[in-house]
Design a protein with these regions (language model features):
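Catalytic alpha/beta core domains of metabolic enzymes, predominantly
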Residues: 79-222
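Glycine-rich adenosine-cofactor-binding loop
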Residues: 168, 223-231, 342-345, 352, ...
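NAD(P)-binding Rossmann-fold cofactor-contacting core
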Residues: 385-414
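Conserved S-adenosyl-L-methionine
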Residues: 382-386, 491-493
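Adenosine-phosphate binding glycine-rich loop
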Residues: 467-533
Length: 533
């Protein structure tokens, strides 16, 4: 347990109750059933203590020297330790080291922190800290700017000459915190709750021990993740980690943010390609697969991605031009290859098959023109369905139809186009196109989206022309009941919610990675509980 006392003893007040505070801290240390790390972090390294340095050192002496229950560790900054011979001498009196002549049990953690970036002189600082005889443990933490920063942290931990703590701060640094046991990290840090975090990106102890099961992580643990921008709100870590635990699979699944510009597919493809290549090169991580989400589903099929990674897309990915699942396979002699899949298409096919006697010959409307709409359209056309793609702008719908079927042939109906069994129409023409199934593949109705109260499909207007067995399917899963699904249920139509699709695509991913049957009911329950449904 780390006791962060810098906000309790800021040092700038000259408080007359310092003696009482010291006695309170001594009692806390004595009563703690676990080893204590005592830290009074200076303001210049991200803490709250902004008082005189001699007062801070005096406080630490009173808590570590000539007391019945001293802390197990004292964390003190390398920069402050090196700044003054007097401070260095006093800190050395508080801790055990080769020249210590007192009966002292506290050990020194020499630490360094940079909340902005990787320090340019990081390796020099580490060499100084490792060479200090009084330091039992060395700690370094800096703000990660990419996944690559985590990989360097792991390399440092693996080769460290003495016990070392290496942590990445910020959204990009979570991997370093969770995988610390895999690379001999002396320990990692977690907060009791989000509001109590002492560094940006610090997970809660419930997430670290529960969802990520960090105590079960070892050198052979397989690593998976969700690649996207952003990924902090993804529910994939929740369900895949639970699935690994349920099946006894030695794996952990992490958010893997990759910064991207959604408007520049080539740049996005380059960014994700570099990251995937770096992860594959870091063999000790044992990276085995990933989910691919916005904005990389189509970027991963771009030539700019292929320039970095040897890939093998399956037939669905080739036809759709987008992938949402990556599996790393060794093709022999230690050369890995990336297999690409689209489990969105797999999930949509399975759900349509469950909901209908047959897809072949059925008329199905897909609203939207993005990656999910493309996967849905492919699932329908490849199974003989009659597809109608509806978008606000006809050219968007037409472009999607062309990607599915080749060049578009215009028909003689106003505003419509088709080739074979696929047609493109404007969204406001849906009333003229009664169908057996309607699928929303837009963010309309999504919590936090551009139109959370909007109706993606005009259910009320369609209601008088459709039989009750008509199916309304929403790919949005938050909220579980979107405005469109609520309207469909009010009119007695059959519905498929976005949670069902999210779970089905995750099930397909899990089974591709592990070869084990996924615990689908567990996945479904966890997602609905998290969403409050």
């Amino acid at each position: 347990v780390e006791l962060r006392i810098d906000s309790y003893f800021p040092g700038s007040e000259g408080d007359a109750e310092d003696t009482l505070r010291i006695e309170t801290l001594r009692s806390l240390i004595a009563d703690c059933p676990l080893p204590v790390i005592l830290t009074c972090r200076s303001a210049e390294e991200g803490g709250d203590y902004d008082g005189d340095e001699s007062d801070r050192v005096s406080l630490l002496e009173k808590l570590c020297v000539n007391v019945e229950h001293p802390p197990a560790y004292l964390d003190f900054e390398l920069a402050a330790y090196q700044r003054s011979a007097n401070i260095r001498q006093k800190i050395n009196l508080c801790v055990d080291h080769p020249k210590q002549q007192r009966d002292v049990r506290t050990r020194l953690i020499l630490s360094m922190h940079d909340f902005d970036q990787r320090p340019s002189d990081l390796m020099r600082r580490l060499a100084d800290a490792w060479a200090e005889p009084a330091a039992s443990v060395v700690k370094f933490a800096y703000r990660c700017r990419s996944i690559r920063d985590n990989l360097e942290i792991f390399e440092i931990l693996r080769d460290a000459p003495k016990p070392t703590i290496g942590l990445g701060m910020g959204e990009f640094g979570l991997m370093s915190r969770v995988l610390a046991p895999k690379f001999n990290g002396f320990l990692t840090f977690a907060s009791l709750r989000d509001s109590a975090a002492t560094a940006p990106g610090q997970p809660t102890i419930s997430d670290l021990l529960g969802m990520y099961r960090t105590r079960s992580i070892g050198k052979d643990t397989r690593v998976y993740g969700v690649i996207g921008w952003p990924v902090t709100q993804s529910m994939s870590p929740l369900i895949h980690n639970a699935g690994f635990e349920a099946r006894g699979w030695d794996g952990v699944y992490l958010p893997m943010p990759v910064a991207a510009d959604a408007s520049d597919i080539e740049l996005s493809a380059h960014s994700v390609g570099v990251t995937v290549n770096q992860m594959m090169d870091a063999r000790k991580i044992r990276w085995c697969g990933a989910s691919i989400t916005i904005p990389f589903k189509e970027a991963i099929e771009h030539d700019a991605f292929a320039s970095h990674v040897v890939r093998d897309p399956n037939e669905d990915v080739i036809d759709i031009g987008a992938a949402n699942t990556l599996a790393v396979r060794d093709r022999g002699e230690g050369f890995p290859i990336v297999d690409l899949y689209n489990t969105d298409a797999t999930a949509i096919s399975a759900l349509l098959q469950d909901a209908m006697e047959r897809v072949s010959g059925s008329k199905i409307v897909v609203v939207g023109a993005g990656g999910v709409a493309l996967a849905a359209g492919h699932s329908i056309v490849s199974r003989g369905g009659k597809l109608i793609v509806a978008a606000r702008r006809l050219e968007q719908a037409t472009a999607l139809v062309e990607r599915l079927n080749g060049p578009t042939v215009w028909d003689d109906e106003p505003g419509g186009s088709f080739r074979g069994e696929a047609k493109a129409v404007k969204l406001d023409e849906l009333l003229e196109r009664p169908a057996d199934v309607y699928i929303n593949c837009t963010p309309v109705g999504m919590t936090g989206g551009p139109d959370p109260e909007g109706l993606s499909i005009p259910v009320h207007d369609l209601a008088g022309t459709l039989p009750p067995e008509t199916v309304f399917f929403d790919t949005v899963y938050n909220p579980i009941e979107t405005p469109m699904l609520k309207a469909a249920r009010e009119h007695g139509f059959r519905t498929i919610d976005g949670v069902e699709m999210f779970v089905r695509q995750a099930v397909a991913q899990f089974e591709l990675w592990t070869g084990e049957q996924a615990p689908m009911q567990l996945f479904d329950r966890l997602v609905r509980e998290r969403l409050g449904g």
